[in-house]
Amino acid sequence: MTEIFRSEKDGFPLVGLRSEVVEISIVPALGARVFSLFNRRTRREWMWSASEKRKLFPNAFGDAFEQGTLTGADECIPTILPCRWKGRDLPDHGEVWSRSWQLDEKDLAAEKLTTSVTLPLTPFLLTRTISLNNADLRFDYQLESKAPESEPFLWSWHPLLCFEDGDYFELPSPTEDLKVEIALNPTGARGETWPVERLRQMAGSQDGFLKAFVPAGNGKAALVHGKTKERLELSWNPDQLPWLGIWITRGGWNGYHHAALEPTHGAPDALDVAVEQWRAHATLACGETTHWHMNIHLTE
């Protein structure tokens, strides 16, 4: 049985779904971010926050992402890093994380969290539907183009996940190498290839960070809590989302300790580089609509 609930945090309405195992809540007014992903049986909160009180506040369109609440999981589209594309100054972490999304009350009555947003610069309409079945979540996405011509884009799920000493990733099979976006301690530059062992070393660091990409492989990845072996498992269709972004900071970025697994259409994080150099991106034709999905499973 799935229960619908509403609450409020710092003046912002939250809406969520609850099963015997999982509780998830979102903030429609703040990018429809996933505020909390909570295992009710183990009492583990998977979503990290920069603020001990998980404080929420609004941001202006175009703000740097690190000026935001840094809480939970955001949607990033059509870029992650800021860049200029087709005469548009695309903002840091995309166009929708700082925007208010529309909640579909009819779908909510049917135990679905459906929210939608029109991008301010790129002529797209993005709709996301979250459904819950016991310990399993499904995120369904629909992207509709209102553009007069084809538009390349990147979409990435952008969760900030709690990460502690002893925690570790399980990456898609097969994964042998990482394609670096940026790294510190050790330093790495965009396009470098690192052995996957470097990720394990970074997880044990106290002063580094790493953003890298791997091919989606079998479309499965997980974050494992080292002490309890609890797992957050992601699965997706690698034909739809052929890359996985990996982010980890062990004190190297603003002193924070968190991690992310980011299924995505392409790489690296800047749309212009993804199109012109790496040639790893998606494209939506004039008037076209596309769909993709992602699954999350929480284990004890």
Question: Language model features by range: what are they?
Answer:
Residues M1-R138, K146-L154, H158-E300:
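Surface-exposed acidic/polar loop and edge beta-strand patches at domain peripheries
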